[in-house]
Amino acid sequence: MRIRVFGAAIAALAMAAGAQAAFELPCKAGDRPCFIQAMRAHPARSAAFWKPSLSRPVTERLGPAPAELVEFLHLDNAANGFPEKPRASRLSADFMADVRGAIADLPPAVRRAFDATFAGVWFVDDLGGTGFTDMYSDASGNPVGGFIVLDAAVLGKFTANAWATWKENTPFKPAKAWKLEARIEGAATDDRRGAIRYILLHELGHVLSINRGVHPRWDIPPAEVPATARFPFFDLSWTIDRKGDRYASIFDAGFTAVRGGRFLKC
């Protein structure tokens, strides 16, 4: 499968975020193996692609998603059966001020995740969720860093508690008999900046897991996880069903209804 490689620099692409490209998917609808192969070969998964971004200060690794990254997200959504077609965001100055403020709010130990291997926080609309994290690899295919994508259209319309309430309600059908509300911030910080800060913390957890033995790589099938690999934190809650090529919760027997639902797409 040949994936087209773009030559434009990240900075130029970010400045031209208003011009949205039309992406032609390289695989037939529903052909997940084809999409997975295309994603693995995509420039956005390579360290070389992120080199221009990594050469800039961490505070400048923010902005509308470059075209290659948007294309990669189209592939990921198609591989997972999501209908959304992401497009680069047009970001207002006040929104970006909230993003920078949310990053500044993070504890120093967390901000250290924004290191030399962190390729930045990039924004799209119509992601199909609020946040997305993936890794990029060196020429030998070894993961060496990560990047985050956030949906600016979603974050732009919610305060922290409103976003959390919306997210917690997504697995359930509305009913007059009950109501679910979530509170993640006090009244003084229940704003858009608080929502951005919360989802950044979540996605940074994924970034921090790269190359740290927290859990198996998410870009390989469970059946292909090396049998000799050890993941002490992962083992507290999960096992690898190699025959079924899936991860199985050790709590499945006690919560049989959980396997019938889909509870989270960040």
Tell where the protein language model's regions lie, with residue ranges:
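Auxiliary, metal-adjacent structural segments of Zn-dependent hydrolase domains
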Residues: 93-175
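Short pre-active-site segment immediately N-terminal to the catalytic Zn-binding motif
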Residues: 178-200
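N-terminal low-structure segments adjacent to metalloprotease catalytic domains
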Residues: 2-10, 18-123, 215-220
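Short, hydrophobic/amphipathic alpha-helical packing segments
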Residues: 96-106, 193-205
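Post-HExxH zinc-binding segment in Zn-dependent metallohydrolases
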Residues: 212-266
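Active-site recognition of the HExxH zinc-binding catalytic motif
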Residues: 150, 198-214
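Short, solvent-exposed secondary-structure capping/transition elements
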Residues: 158-163, 209-218
